[in-house]
Amino acid sequence: MLEQARRRLAGLNAKLRHHDVLYHGLDAPEVTDHQYDLLVQEKKRLLDEFPDISQYDDYADVVGTPKIDSRFPKVQHLEPMLSLENAFTVQDVEKFITRVRRFLELQPDDILELSCELKMDGMSFSALYHGGKLTRVATRGNGHFGEDITTNAMVLRGLPHQLDSAPEVLEVRGEIYMHHEDFEKLRGSCNFANPRNAAAGSIRQLNQKIVEERNLSYVAYSAVNSTFATQQEILKQLDEWGFHTNKQVLFTDKIEEAIAFYNSVYTTRSALGYDIDGVVYKVNSTNFQKLLGATGKSPRWAIAHKFPSTEARTKLLDITVQVGRTGVVTPIAELEPINIGGVMVSRASLHNLNEIERKDVRIGDLVIVKRAGEVIPQVVDVDKTLRSSGTQKFVFPSHCPSCGSKLHREPGEVALRCVAELSCKAQALERVKHFVSRDGLNIMGLGAKQIEFFCNHGLIGSIADIFSLEEKLHGINLDTEHGWGEKSVANLIAAIRNSATVRLSNFIFALGIRFIGVGAAKLVAEHYRSYKNWHQAMLALTETHDTVQIRGLGEKSISSLKAFFSVQGNLEVLESLSAKLNILDEASPAQRGSSAISGKTVVFTGTLESMSRTEAKLQAESLGAKVANSVSANTWLLVAGSNPGSKHEKALSLNVRVIDEQTWVKMVEDARS
């Protein structure tokens, strides 16, 4: 029995070593995180059951595997960057708390506060500062030595290069990751399996310009050798220094609240726009952290509460294709419905033709499907051991299934694309959905189903048609249609009217220009400040072979802007939209940071004469203010129009400053001058 256990341990270590090399060394994992965790758990159970075989454990306390054939110099961390112990159940978390309390010899009435933070699914890094100046950025590597990625990290947006009032030597740690939106753009030109691999591969590019174009994000979560008393103080100071920190954090001494936070994050994670794979619980007191110390592999004062498996096995019934907003034709797996994490899944993305060929996916196969918060789940693997003789290879279409145009593959890309743009009905439909989305014009009540309804009835054919919808609906009785009533129609019309005032950055994003996401749209808007300036500059750009320089924007984004303005149909849509919308000027970062209302809470009440409530709200937000719906002790200013109501009375009772509309207009003008 003992010999069998020893052989099983050797086999598990061989598998773990193999997968660690693929994951940490080559950024090309063969198995999912869940499958890897199962191997780790099996090894732990084996060692618990047969403690005598631990002497044969030749792969213990391993943090990571150094990057193979690394082109980046290796550097040593100030302190080891250890991995975290995992918890998979509430009982595991309770055992962790019990273990910590016992180690610290706490009494039942003694308080043990936890910091509950999102566990980012990206690539760990450390940033070293000497005298407040950024001198080095490194990957985690094997936990003791990492790769020097300083040059590439310098283009990470928002990573401070200089800190005020910092310790002489400070090491800040965090995670580099990629938003889903940026990964989807990249997927057409690079063959990364997921956002985490894309982030790890992108930060290791030899060309810094490519790194910048990949639009990587980061979050900082700890500061080594700092003198702060708590993790809460560390996060606050990191934020004040200008680091990006995750604001979704809870500090509590009650395990019930920590678990409730975990459950809340688990159910809402799909709205984050990036991948997380659990919640990290840390002992808040840094003094307690020092007392607890670490094992060879992980700190004793923290644990990662991992999300449950989001994978399942089901039959691939068929493969269809769909056309996206930018013309990318994506193969979709039509599945035998399966419950994954409490959600019935019948469709999943196959990414592109290269992925189908690489995985050798065939119709009739048993496939492994992963759902990790994405809008469309993914086929991550094929179970070829159970493949029958009746499976069929998929033949990718040569023409667009929507408009019939011949599909093209641009140089350096893996995706096939329909280039008919707005004359392709499928692309036009997806652009309308994008246009009304939260970061676009944010039209409530005009979701995917409503848009498809109006498109199918010939009422919307392009984004410009949205603002003619009210007129077209006259004489049409929607009450007879399923899902529509007098109130829902009235609410929709009101929402469209309210959206007619829009900030320039939101408008640019809403157009759905390729490579122009939320961040890029903001950079463009801040550069040109007004719609007129932007429109004129882009038209001039199409008439020259020269390019323009917009701080923070890469060549692909500039070329995409130029291409968009080179299409006559797009210019016609812009002309129609600019006549119907009130596109507000964009404030510069300097204006937002230095304005008198930056960081202050403003409330509007009553009827405004010179602008809508939406326009006033956008004005305030563009200058860095926070707009609230109700007056409280935290309110800095109340702008009162005619018939102000109870908010005015409450403001007076709380000694909140109250001004009229004319004073507000003057305040905005002064802030922008």
Curated annotation (Swiss-Prot):
Any Pfam family hit: DNA_ligase_OB
SMART domains named in the record: BRCT (SM00292), LIGANc (SM00532)
GO biological process, any: DNA replication
EC number: 6.5.1.2
Domain BRCT, first and last residues per copy: 592-673
Cellular component aspect of the GO annotation: cytosol
Record carries keyword DNA repair: yes
SUPFAM superfamilies: BRCT domain (SSF52113), DNA ligase/mRNA capping enzyme, catalytic domain (SSF56091), Nucleic acid-binding proteins (SSF50249), RuvA domain 2-like (SSF47781)
Annotated residues for binding of Zn(2+): C400, C403, C418, C424
UniProt xrefs under InterPro entries: BRCT_dom, BRCT_dom_sf, DisA/LigA_HHH, DNA_ligase, DNA_ligase_AS, DNAligase_adenylation, DNAligase_N, NA-bd_OB-fold
Role: DNA ligase that catalyzes the formation of phosphodiester linkages between 5'-phosphoryl and 3'-hydroxyl groups in double-stranded DNA using NAD as a coenzyme and as the energy source for the reaction. It is essential for DNA replication and repair of damaged DNA.
Protein's name according to its UniProt entry: DNA ligase
